[in-house]
Amino acid sequence: MTCVLAGGYSQVSLAQQAKSGKLTQFVNPRIGTGGHGHVFLGANVPFGYVQLGPTEPSRGWDWCSGYHHSDSILIGFGHQHLSGTGIGDLGDVAFLPVVDGNQKQIKFSHDNENVRPGYYAVKLQQPNVWVELTATQRAGFQRYTFGADAQQAQLVLDLKQGIGWDAAKDFNVDNTTATTVAGHRFSKGWANDQKAFFFAEFSQPVTVKPLGAGRWLITAADVTKPLLVKTGLSAVSAENAKLNLEKEIPGWDFRQVVADADAAWNKELAKVNIETSDSTSRRIFYTAMYHTMTAPSVFSDVNGQYRGADGKVYDGNFTNYTTLSLWDTYRAAHPLMTMIHTDMLPDMASTFINIYRQQGKLPVWHLMGNETNCMVGNPGIPVLADMVLKGYVKDKEGAYEAMKKSAMLDERGMGLLKKYGYLPYDKEPTKETVAKGLEYALADACVAKVARMLGKKEDAKYFENRSKAYSKYFDKETGFMRGLSSDGKYRVPCNPFSAEHRADDYTEGNAWQYTWLVPHDVHGLVKLFGNEKKFVTKLDSLFIVTGEMGANASPDISGLIGQYAHGNEPSHHVLYMYNYVGQPWKAARLLRQTLDEMYKDDFDGLSGNEDVGQMSAWYVLSSVGLYQVEPAGGKYVIGSPIFDKAELNVGKGKTFNIVCKNNSKENMYVQSVKLNGKPYSKSYIMYNDIMKGGTLELQMGNQPSKWGTRPADRP
């Protein structure tokens, strides 16, 4: 029987639509533009350098992307934005249609916006103009259609304007002709030394008049004709910006560029095809897929040149990437990438290795070629290790050198780790020692795995021992990870609910949330509790207990179920820990609750910052029933899929299908599993089995079962 879905599509025709490239219709780019989502709204293509979209005045933390649904004032259409971050930056090379050169902002209504992947439009009143935006990887394309009452077609080019921390320090229009403007904008912000060069071309002759304060008035010759603006960007030079533009947008067919952007999105969205009768979940899913591909961003020009982490220009034989929010994305976004974007991985690995060679360590949080050192731990290590262990890195020795050297530095608390075997809270001036120590431990486990793979036994032993340092912070008396002093005493008093942002032993969290940050050795953590029963009792309590975190708690602690904070990344693996102790049904119930309550088809549809794709990647993986808990190596824990079928295109013409029989909101519990037609009792599946292609068939029911309970079947 064929089940008819909302909108008139059947499950059969949905699959056909996926293959014919119609998935962009299921994307709602407004999800996450309100609340604390901090999501970019505008025109871009998958993993593009350019994110062309509206910029509003920076009014606080919720404007980190330059846009928030609560606002109705525009100050420009900038060519670069961040998505889902907790710090604002970029906003480079902004244009604004104006009545005259004195105008610096425009009111707008969300009712007059039209947005879909690769396209943004808005109708403005003062001036009366229809603004349309689209983009390629390295160029933006704008079309301004002025109303019949318009006296002039005028734009202001603003090179001083930026978002959040961004402050322009050097900018100019360096060259103009009758139809072109070229220049640069150098800024200091979250990215300490960002260089942006641009080359803009207009569809009709223009005059360019400097207004001062980084603003230029551009007046077109004919107000009765649409004014089109094509702008190439580069971090290397204006000449490269021109090359990028000539290569990617050689003509003036705006509709074709929109169609090409739509096709690019459809191609990538079709990496996962789902079948479901729930139209809302379908929109949430494909919007989540869309959000996972805003970054990493291409950061090399069409001629291969890119600006390195040392500020020098390099000729690369690979695609270089930036916007590496690794503390967030090592958990789900990159493991998802290793499943459906395998073609990107060799270049991604080359990016990491070359960043190491240029700055002396792997990236921590890289933005526009700049190391921001934002967040804690060594998050570049698990991402690179995962690519090595999964077979996508040719230069394994170079990758290992980068990991080892990064783990053996003395900065950011690692010197204390080498001296004491942990990070004493009384010796680390920047605080957050428990969070740092736990992150270093899981990264060390990844170094150990690669060392063992390469036959480096002594190194493997050393880093395996260091990866056990998490046990030093565990206080068996209270059952929490706690700050430890240099003389071996736990910090007192112990209030596991308390959270003092940037001033205690945790990063954007508390003891309840950080006690579980041992994804690389869950069984070792269980032993610290004494036995599985005590571990489960504590884990059960996590989702029930409530308490006051205090006035200075981080706003990132959000999306709470008890003290489980889905709105922030350190919690993202925790639900799956039940599989490790033979109780996958508890994970299933909580997974369904989280998928249902923390993701909505609404502008306020995310429970926390989108964090450059991580929040959405969790949804993508968990909704199809898989999650890589251990940071590297490819062990994907099986959860509770919400779709009747998910088809993952894993490359080389192969697909991995996840089929759920008897699935419904009530039938959330796995009863039995078959892998390629044969009974499968394990509550996890290995990466290599996924990438071979095949079918994982799950029989679902409304009661817990014995599936996955035996010790031999646990992760």
Language-model regions, residue ranges each:
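Bacterial Sec-dependent N-terminal signal peptides
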Residues: 1-18
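Extracellular attachment/recognition segments
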Residues: 669
